[in-house]
């Protein structure tokens, strides 16, 4: 995980992933933790999972019956559960190259920052039409607000094909809020 935080190419091309990695536990844990382990742990509050969802990550899963490639959205089966069968392993994590005129961001809310579990994690990856503020592609993912990390599809749809304004972004945020169903454990 620490490599995701510090590698210049990750910082440049996948800033949401780099920011999510920086918010993940303490440095000692980041030095040992792996992306695959974080995916297979399938925690609803996993810090890097919303960033990976927003970046349209694919997973290559290998087992005795062959291999399959799944979008990360289809890997989670519930809190702490994945669709991996007995004797299957997560062999590869694939990130598409970002489109031109795109950016990504991850924001975590937790009482104590990186040393605490997220009470909310939000990642977005937005691509604009060349030379304009019209949204060509939008992916918004939420963590710690559902049994698994989720995409906020309705919020994404609000932005697609429209010029980004403060009002439109607020409308998308309201749609993302509707997708959130956090547990009541406070």
List each language-model region with its residue ranges.
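C-terminal structural segment of proteins
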Residues: 1-186
């Amino acid at each position: 995980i620490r490599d995701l935080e510090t590698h210049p190419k990750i910082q440049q091309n996948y800033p949401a992933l780099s920011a999510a990695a920086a918010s993940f536990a303490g440095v000692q844990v980041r030095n040992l933790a792996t992306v695959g382990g974080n995916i297979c742990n399938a925690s609803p509050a996993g810090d890097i999972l919303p960033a990976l969802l927003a970046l349209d990550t694919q997973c290559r899963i290998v087992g005795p019956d062959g291999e399959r490639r799944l979008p990360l959205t289809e890997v989670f089966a519930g809190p702490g559960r994945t669709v991996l069968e007995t004797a299957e392993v997560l062999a590869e994590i694939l990130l598409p190259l970002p489109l031109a005129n795109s950016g990504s961001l991850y924001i975590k809310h937790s009482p104590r920052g990186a040393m605490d579990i997220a009470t909310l994690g939000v990642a977005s990856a937005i691509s604009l039409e060349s030379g304009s503020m019209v949204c060509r592609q939008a992916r918004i993912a939420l963590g710690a607000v559902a049994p698994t990390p989720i995409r906020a599809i309705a919020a994404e749809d609000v932005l697609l094909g429209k010029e980004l304004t403060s009002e439109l972004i607020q409308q998308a945020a309201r749609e993302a809020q509707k997708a959130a169903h956090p547990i009541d454990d406070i």
